[in-house]
Amino acid sequence: MSGNTLGTLFCVTSFGESHGPAIGCVIDGCPPGLSLTAADIQGELDRRKPGTSRHVTQRREPDEVEILSGVFEGVTTGTPIALLIRNQDQRSKDYGNIAETFRPGHADYPYWQKYGIRDYRGGGRSSARETAVRVAAGAVARKWLSERYGIVIRGYMAQLGPLPIPFVSWDAVGDNPFFAPNAEIVPQLESYMDELRKSGDSVGARINVVASGVPVGWGEPVYDRLDADIAYAMMSINAVKGVEIGAGFASVAQLGTEHGDELTPEGFLSNNAGGVLGGISSGQDVLVSMAIKPTSSIRLDRRSIDREGNPVIVNTHGRHDPCVGIRATPVAEAMLALVLMDHALRHRAQCGDVRTATPQIAALAPEGVQAVPSPRAE
């Protein structure tokens, strides 16, 4: 199996399966001199770990990270950083009934057809369990980006199933299990999930992520565009079926006069581009939104086939998230951090000495600033 590495200069290679002894990753390319301890990583892992509320899987994993290499006396050395998270609460017997069958909507069928072998225990390599190591690696990237550039990466749930979640305040995000930016809607979300869990079904979600403080110039103009790499990274997250940058698909209904982000000496007047123009960061907030499909493993009867191609009825009795989107916010934040970290190093290597006479304008102009009207053609 190939395709387990993300990045060009800041490279992260993950390994491990849902019910194996451990999962982990190797980070290659982290600059030396970054102060780093397990505690710096653990805080992010705790935001993602399972069993934290009744609305997520009840698999109890402490997700305690071990730093095996690349750090000496609390400082990165520039050598590969190996991170390990041991699995402690596997319950493989729950999956015996799907060993010979394929769950609809899951990776079971294509995995079997591609490799001729499949670890059916918890989905094996296709399980969202693997995202824990992405969060661990992302914590390293976030720390460097924060200390070096003051970049802040934050995410929140924008929609749970049919329920949109109006943004009110970042302060509310950390105070509820949904990462919802609106405290008033949390009881409604809880009631919805309680009924969903009783029904045995699952539901999707929409997650928004914002990176503030990203300098102008990161990204390449053709194949390695910053927005292309962000979309690639987000689409690699389990269950993600769509990604938007900035206005995204709403751009279809906009006019050019509405979509184009005008510039003034005081700053940009809007951010429909989501902080990326021509594949290169503009200095505005990088805005990303992703759609997550409903969990494929559900307790309801579904039609499928077995290995011989015979029709069967499948239902799954393991411990699963009825909505994987509930724990996806830290994962999305981590993936954005990894992409930004990689492009930061690439930009520094190629264009770190470039200077222009044009001043960098503010990400958003102060309220009330208007663009100078275009001169009328005679």
UniProtKB/Swiss-Prot annotation:
Please name the Pfam families in this protein's record: Chorismate_synt
InterPro entries in UniProt = Chorismate_synth (IPR000453), Chorismate_synth_AroC_sf (IPR035904), Chorismate_synthase_CS (IPR020541)
Q: Which domain of life is it from?
A: Bacteria
Pathway, per record = Metabolic intermediate biosynthesis; chorismate biosynthesis; chorismate from D-erythrose 4-phosphate and phosphoenolpyruvate: step 7/7
The molecular function GO annotations come to: chorismate synthase activity; FMN binding
Q: What note does UniProt attach to the cofactor annotation?
A: Reduced FMN (FMNH(2)).
Q: Which GO terms describe its biological process?
A: amino acid biosynthetic process; aromatic amino acid family biosynthetic process; chorismate biosynthetic process
| EC number annotated for this UniProt entry | 4.2.3.5
- Which reactions does this protein catalyse? 5-O-(1-carboxyvinyl)-3-phosphoshikimate = chorismate + phosphate
Binding-site positions, NADP(+):
R48, R54
Cite the entry's keywords alphabetically: Amino-acid biosynthesis, Aromatic amino acid biosynthesis, FAD, Flavoprotein, FMN, Lyase, NADP
Q: Where does FMN bind?
A: R125, S126, S127, N238, A239, G278, K293, P294, T295, S296, S297, R319
Q: Which SUPFAM superfamilies match?
A: Chorismate synthase, AroC
Q: HAMAP family annotated for this entry?
A: Chorismate_synth (MF_00300)
Q: Which family does it belong to?
A: Belongs to the chorismate synthase family.
Q: What is the recorded name of this protein? A: Chorismate synthase
